[in-house]
A protein has these predicted regions:
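Alpha-helical recognition/docking segments in bacterial nutrient-uptake
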Residues: 1-3, 59-169, 173, 233
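N-terminal helix-turn-helix DNA-binding module of bacterial transcription factors
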Residues: 1-58, 332-334
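Short beta-strand segments enriched in small/hydrophobic residues
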Residues: 19-24, 55-69, 76, 170, ...
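Periplasmic-binding protein-like
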Residues: 114-122, 180-182, 214, 235-245, ...
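Hinge/beta->alpha junction and helix N-cap segments in small-molecule ligand-binding domains
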Residues: 35, 65-75, 93-102, 145, ...
Length: 334
């Protein structure tokens, strides 16, 4: 009997299950109850079980989005692909279906596929999921985590707070004092950080933050359109709007057009991301650039280096920069 077979037999006895059940758990197959799966995984941990190297690695990185439907996703894919190709690997995409936390079926599939590393975008991983991935030697990195990641969760992001500061200072330097803000999802750390940085810059300049002109969207163009109309139809509409991403900023541009306003003569608009579409909007969009491709590349390298046993920083934040185009100008006299 081989050493691995004997080990599986010992684990099966400890967990009071059959060796085939242990095999199902190791390979992420269905047909095992949650309670039994937990019992087997506890036995695996207590025995210090490590699957054979040829079963641990497949030459690809799994890149996980809530949904792959935007230029934002394309930029991240480019970065991850660059890192993968440099290591002789490919990239597999999967979706969690508009959920920050991947479900158990996704986790089972990842265990079956055995990628060399996993990069999750806008995600929170529960402790049980982290343990299952670690048990199978699958390193993971969260890119732009939805919440504040635990110290043991490697993550990559951009300097979101500083990006908010840069957007606010630009509008303040142009002379704007009545500014609306459309943040991204309020439960996402990056959204809150951008709004917090923006507000801090206003406080520093002694300019009141308009709580009545703050809205929260879902990073969608439709949100920018709807919430932009709300802000622009206030009794005292803002002279400028900072949107938490470029897609919502494009929605604000459309809202202004629908209300007969000209950008930037009647309204200044600042976005966030610097997607390619920002250069071709009408007018070209002033925005805060976060290096999405570089973020994807760094996240992939973190995961692959962890697979190779290298130890790197658990948190990487890349710098943002303001890109001034034609959607901002000094406020017109009213």
């Amino acid at each position: 009997m081989s050493k691995s077979a004997a080990t599986l037999t010992h684990i099966a006895r400890t967990a009071e299950v059959s060796p085939s059940t242990v095999s199902k758990v190791l390979n992420g197959r269905s047909g095992v109850s949650a309670a039994t799966r937990e019992r087997v995984e506890q036995a695996l941990r207590s025995h210090g079980y490590s699957p054979p190297a040829e079963r641990r690695r497949q030459p690809f990185i799994e890149l996980v989005f809530e949904r792959v439907d935007s230029s934002f996703a394309i930029e991240i894919i480019r970065g991850v692909q660059s890192a993968a190709v440099a290591r002789g690997m490919s990239v597999v995409l999967s979706e969690t279906g508009n959920r920050h936390t991947p479900g158990p079926e996704w986790l089972n599939q990842v265990v079956r596929r055995r990628p060399s590393g996993v990069v999750l975008v806008f995600s929170d991983l529960p402790a049980a999921a982290k343990e299952r991935l670690a048990l199978r030697g699958i390193p993971f990195v969260v890119l732009d985590p939805a919440g504040d990641p635990a110290p043991d969760v490697p993550s990559v992001g951009s300097a979101n707070w500083s990006g908010g500061v840069q957007a606010a200072r630009h509008l303040l330097e142009l002379g704007h004092r009545s500014i609306g803000v459309i943040g991204g999802p309020q439960d996402m750390m990056c959204s809150r950080a951008r709004v917090s940085g923006f507000r801090a810059a206003l406080d520093e300049a002694g300019v009141p933050f308009r709580a009545d002109a703050l809205r929260w969207g879902n990073f969608l163009r439709e949100d920018g359109l709807r919430l932009g109309r709300e802000l622009l139809q206030l009794p005292d509409p803002p002279t400028a709007i900072f949107a938490g991403n470029d897609l919502m900023a494009l929605g604000v541009l459309e809202a202004a057009r629908m209300l007969g306003l000209t950008v930037p003569r009647d309204l200044s608009v600042v976005g966030y991301d610097d997607l390619e579409i920002a250069r071709w909007s009408g007018p070209p969009l002033t925005t805060v650039r976060q290096p999405l491709a570089e973020m994807g590349e760094q996240a992939a390298l973190l995961a692959l280096d962890a697979q190779d046993g290298a130890v790197r920083a658990a948190r990487v934040d890349l710098a943002t920069s303001l890109v001034v185009r034609e959607s901002t100008a000094p406020p017109s006299a009213r």
